[in-house]
Design a protein with these regions (language model features):
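Short acidic (Asp/Glu) and glycine-rich catalytic loops that position anionic groups and cofactors
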Residues: 131-133, 275-276
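Short alpha-helical segments and helix-capping/turn motifs at coil-helix boundaries
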Residues: 3, 152-156, 281-283
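N-terminal low-complexity, intrinsically disordered segments
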Residues: 17-53
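A surface/extracellular/periplasmic glyco- and lipid-processing/surface-interacting theme
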Residues: 136-149
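Sequence/fold signature of self-assembling virion shell proteins
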Residues: 186-303
Length: 303
């Protein structure tokens, strides 16, 4: 689970430190120690975008049966209003959570988060250098494909340049098909003289599927079937897309040092009419407007 970092201002500040593989020096006992020079770091700041879904409830919606309500329940408009309020809060929270998950996946897969919406078109760039693209017959499924060799090389590359032990691989839909269909993978898995791993797919909660385990490199294999509705890339033709691109392979650690930062939420407090700043990951509000009478339910977040 990624713990949230709640910021008390609208700006989030990030310090980026690049590690290395230096070792402590040998010294003579009478000469004393040798300084291990500290690495530098870069500080970056960013104003997180506003995520602000809302819903509107009017009087006529409360006079008729809600979806799923018994035909003869006898619920009053006031009771329907209370139930609808809870359902609206849950809907807005789910939509915001999906947006946060999409942001996290974009950061992991591409190293960038495109912020595209009404009045905003920006990119958060984490400066990733650990992206590899296979081409031609070297692509998985090609005549020169070396799937197990690729996974071993990429694991070593992360260990050397990223200073982390990756122990999980997440395969996109097409990458998973190519992995299972690869003759070398099938041959190694069928070798009874060597334990190179086990393929034993099973479903896990929330769209996750465990595929199996490799012993060299030491990787647990997973697939993730979650999708999202993209209505901003091409508004004329919105489409449902997989969170994990079909041809992607993600190598990741099961113990990552990740952080989810949130900027502060500022709003006008209805009772006092004053501006208020709240240090929170979610700001849920409900207020009334007239002409016509309606209740506004909104969620504000700055992930």
């Amino acid at each position: 689970e990624i713990m949230p970092s709640l910021v008390g201002s609208e700006m989030c500040i990030r310090d980026r430190v690049k590690g290395d593989r230096r070792m402590a020096a040998f010294v003579h006992p009478r000469l004393g120690g040798k300084v291990l020079t500290a690495n530098g770091y870069t500080t970056e700041s960013y104003k997180p975008p506003l995520v602000n879904p809302y819903d509107v409830t009017t009087a006529d919606q409360l006079m008729t049966r809600l979806p799923g309500e018994d035909l003869y329940s006898g619920m009053t408009p006031a009771q329907r209003a209370a139930q609808k309020l809870m359902e609206e809060y849950a809907t807005l929270n789910d939509a915001t959570t999906r947006r946060e998950e999409w942001m996290a996946v974009q950061a992991i897969v591409t190293g960038t988060i495109p912020i595209v919406g009404e009045g905003v078109n920006e990119v958060i760039d984490f400066g990733f250098t650990n992206k590899i693209t296979l081409s031609g017959e070297n692509k998985w499924g090609g005549t020169k494909a070396d799937i197990l060799g690729n996974l071993g090389d990429w694991t070593d590359k992360v260990l050397t340049g990223g200073f982390a032990n990756v122990d999980m691989a997440i395969l996109g839909k097409e990458a998973k098909k190519k992995f299972f269909a690869d003759a070398n993978v099938q041959k190694m898995m069928d070798n009874r003289r060597m334990n190179m791993g086990e393929i034993n797919p099973r479903d896990l909660p929330n769209g996750v599927k465990f595929l199996g385990h490799l012993t060299d490199p030491n990787l647990d294999l997973y697939a993730y079937g979650e999708v999202y509705y993209d209505d901003w890339t091409n508004p004329e033709e919105p489409a449902t897309k997989p969170l994990i691109p079909d041809n992607a392979v993600i190598l990741i650690s099961s113990h990552p040092n990740y952080m989810m930062a949130y900027g502060a939420c500022t709003y006008i407090e209805q009772a006092s009419g004053l501006w208020v700043t709240s240090q929170t990951s979610r700001l849920l509000r409900s207020y009334v407007e007239h002409h016509p009478d309606r209740r506004m339910v909104e969620l504000q977040a700055h992930p």
